UniProtKB/Swiss-Prot annotation:
Brain. Residues 47-391 are extracellular. GO terms for biological process: adult behavior; AMPA selective glutamate receptor signaling pathway; angiogenesis; calcium-dependent cell-cell adhesion via plasma membrane cell adhesion molecules; cell-cell adhesion involved in synapse maturation; cellular response to calcium ion; cerebellar granule cell differentiation; chemical synaptic transmission. This is Neurexin-1-beta. It comes from Rattus norvegicus (Rat).
Amino acid sequence: MYQRMLRCGAELGSPGGGSSGGAGGRLALLWIVPLTLSGLLGVAWGASSLGAHHIHHFHGSSKHHSVPIAIYRSPASLRGGHAGTTYIFSKGGGQITYKWPPNDRPSTRADRLAIGFSTVQKEAVLVRVDSSSGLGDYLELHIHQGKIGVKFNVGTDDIAIEESNAIINDGKYHVVRFTRSGGNATLQVDSWPVIERYPAGNNDNERLAIARQRIPYRLGRVVDEWLLDKGRQLTIFNSQATIIIGGKEQGQPFQGQLSGLYYNGLKVLNMAAENDANIAIVGNVRLVGEVPSSMTTESTATAMQSEMSTSIMETTTTLATSTARRGKPPTKEPISQTTDDILVASAECPSDDEDIDPCEPSSGGLANPTRVGGREPYPGSAEVIRESSSTTGMVVGIVAAAALCILILLYAMYKYRNRDEGSYHVDESRNYISNSAQSNGAVVKEKQPSSAKSANKNKKNKDKEYYV
């Protein structure tokens, strides 16, 4: 295309075109050169934009664990070295309480809880979730004799699960993850193997869940009472009303720091920092915002996948951690403090007849804390940052070239329309004799030829022959 334009310009500027042809050639060249430069600029800009796709690989361990459900991008507050919102509970204790609105209290068959903490206490209550008054369902994360454990009841008996191998009251930062599905439960501290708990009377829950779909709603309570008599394990945590953080109300106040609490998609500490209307703070509680960098841990950053043997549909949030071999102690390396990925999927309401209050579906997110202090994140992980400006440079260059061409074309048309119409040169030396005579002031007298002479002249003219 550029060669064709150059040929056109050359033809316009050829000698045969005269002065107007030379001007046209110059205008054509003025039009072609900016177009070429603009096109090259657009291509270069587009190439630089295409090169803006960065894939940041965080090198470390070559092990990679697949996650069975979709991963959502972590909140901005949890990227770049933050472990989530942190509160310090001083001497004397304090308490952060979240209350669900009366018409929005969820009933769940599965629960997910994750939190980071550091303390030197041997006895304390970290988090407790209670149902509405009179129901008696609860879930409690506590420290007993320096060991972390969870105790819950969803309508049958108290079920307890504890990590007895990990010492967590050493003043170092630890992360605990708890999952519940019906009466089954898993517990993991840092990178230690996942502890599982399957209570008695919970083996036929899959067939029971299928059968309950065909039981009329009015008979649901009767069936549940009959199942209780048969020793069946109930599965629904009914009408959750409050989340209590700090344990002051239970008489075992927590002293230390708590970071990044996530419960079924709720980021309670973040909400407390934002002065949420449903949260009340009492006692000696102070917002820090991040975990102190002086605290370290010897736990590895390898995520664990919790193994759930039950096949009951999980209707709340889902926690995915990578699988670890049972009986194999965790590899201990002196690395900086880390917290593990907390994966939360969208939630749905249970359709079990045991539900008391209807719940509404909620959506979760991914809490992806990284290492504190701005150091390298988890080994083997990769973050892909895609920029949407891959074609912006090309488009801008083309638009600029087109606009410049239009301006030059309009200028050329303007110059062409306003050109001179032409001038005529008159040779004064070749005037008629009559004009010369008149210019000298002499008057030429016209002679009146006689009729006879004119007749003879006409006769002679008839006899003449003309050759062309």
